[in-house]
Amino acid sequence: MPKLILCRHGQSEWNAKNLFTGWADVKLSKQGIEEAQSAGKKIYDNQIEIDIAFTSLLTRALETTQYILAGSDQQWIPVYKSWRLNERHYGGLQGLNKDDARKKWGEDQVHQWRRSYDVRPPRESEEQREAYLKNRRYQHIDHRMMPYCESLKDTLERVVPFWTDHISQHLLDDKTVLVSAHGNSIRALIKYLEGLSEEDIVGYEIKTGAPLVYELTDDLVVKDKYYL
């Protein structure tokens, strides 16, 4: 039976500081490390054998993947990394304190940027974009595909092709797949997998460092889901 494990990275240093993160590359906090280690132990205790893992290019997800595989004694399995699993790009909000943003733009506007389906936040500056374009981890990507900012809809539109071309192919081979990613890239996968409405998915909360297991039929219809 195909099995998919979705796990949002553990708490990051910027999560702890209440900052918009997006594509900014930050490490796990002490709490985040403990969450990721706990996720690995839960997988180990439940005797789940992972065949392959997918993660993003951002350090907090990469670290979470490493801690999960170490904690479940499966560090040797193949791990594939893709920018398509990166967090939603928060554009000009990245690095700002969320409370300060509410004071500047108002509670309603910030809520709309964070929790609507197809509304984008302000674009990042040209200086910020130039820094991404020069970053080695993105040199292999067509720069025309690099976002200035993203809505959840935009995030889904880059995540789903990666699901179709890569992740789902291993599930169709009856494998157990780990996806260690981010709140919004996981939210996009859940919307697609469960067929949720735009209204339902924007309010869907994703816990940090908590493995969410999907048991699937042979044609990848959700049979059961549960947190470990």
Curated annotation (Swiss-Prot):
Query: What are the record keywords, sorted?
Result: Gluconeogenesis, Glycolysis, Isomerase
Q: Which reaction(s) are listed as its catalytic activity?
A: (2R)-2-phosphoglycerate = (2R)-3-phosphoglycerate
Site (Transition state stabilizer): give the residues.
182
Please give the HAMAP family that the UniProt record associates with this protein: PGAM_GpmA
One MF term from GO for this chain? phosphoglycerate mutase activity
* Claim: Nucleus is one of the keywords in the record: no
Instruction: Note the InterPro entries from the entry.
Output: His_Pase_superF_clade-1, His_PPase_superfam, PG/BPGM_mutase_AS, Phosphogly_mut1
Under which EC number(s) is this enzyme classified? Answer: 5.4.2.11
The broad enzyme category this protein falls into is isomerase
Any one GO biological process: glycolytic process
NCBIfam families referenced in this protein's UniProt entry, alphabetically: pgm_1, PRK14115.1, PRK14119.1
Instruction: Enumerate the residues binding substrate.
Output: 8-15, 21-22, 60, 87-90, 98, 114-115, 183-184
The metabolic or biological pathway listed in the UniProt record of this protein is:
Carbohydrate degradation; glycolysis; pyruvate from D-glyceraldehyde 3-phosphate: step 3/5
Pfam families attached here? Answer: His_Phos_1
Q: Give the active-site positions.
A: 9 (tele-phosphohistidine intermediate), 87 (proton donor/acceptor)
Matching SMART domains: PGAM (SM00855)
This protein is called what? 2,3-bisphosphoglycerate-dependent phosphoglycerate mutase
Coiled-coil annotation: which residues?
A: none
Native organism: Staphylococcus epidermidis (strain ATCC 12228 / FDA PCI 1200)
